[in-house]
From Swiss-Prot:
A Gene Ontology BP annotation from the UniProt entry: defense response to bacterium
Protein's recorded name: 15 kDa protein A
Organism in which the protein naturally occurs: Oryctolagus cuniculus
InterPro entries: Cathelicidin-like, Cathelicidin_CS, Cystatin_dom, Cystatin_sf
Keywords linked to the UniProt accession: Antibiotic, Antimicrobial, Disulfide bond, Secreted, Signal
Gene3D superfamilies: 3.10.450.10
Main location, first listed in the record: secreted
Superkingdom of origin: Eukaryota
Function: Binds to bacterial lipopolysaccharides (LPS), potentiates strongly the early antibacterial effects of BPI. Inhibits the late lethal action of BPI.
Intrachain disulfide bonds: C77-C88, C99-C116
Amino acid sequence: MAGVWKVLVVLVGLAVVACAIPRRRLRYEEVVAQALQFYNEGQQGQPLFRLLEATPPPSLNSKSRIPLNFRIKETVCIFTLDRQPGNCAFREGGEERICRGAFVRRRWVRALTLRCDRDQRRQPEFPRVTRPAGPTA
């Protein structure tokens, strides 16, 4: 249930801040940076995440809808109001997440939806324990 509240708080925060964005056309990188900032604000008491890579759409024909697709990775820093993830090193073996969503801008309404799921292709590495194959004497 706490996870649902966290997502809801992040979405409401994104919608509120998205309304404050000026009417100029935003670059893809700016939208991704804002999405990551709000995602991290929902991580209170948890490690911050930093951008690994962003995949812009092939073309941004639409001025009103920008699809988002980027990967983030856990850092060694814990969330505080003044901490910037860009100043934090990636955590060795840290969790990676794939984020997808959209930034939508219509006349008076601006909203950003975002979902970040664990990257199943990158399972955490655990130390391997080897045991002797035969009986021990």
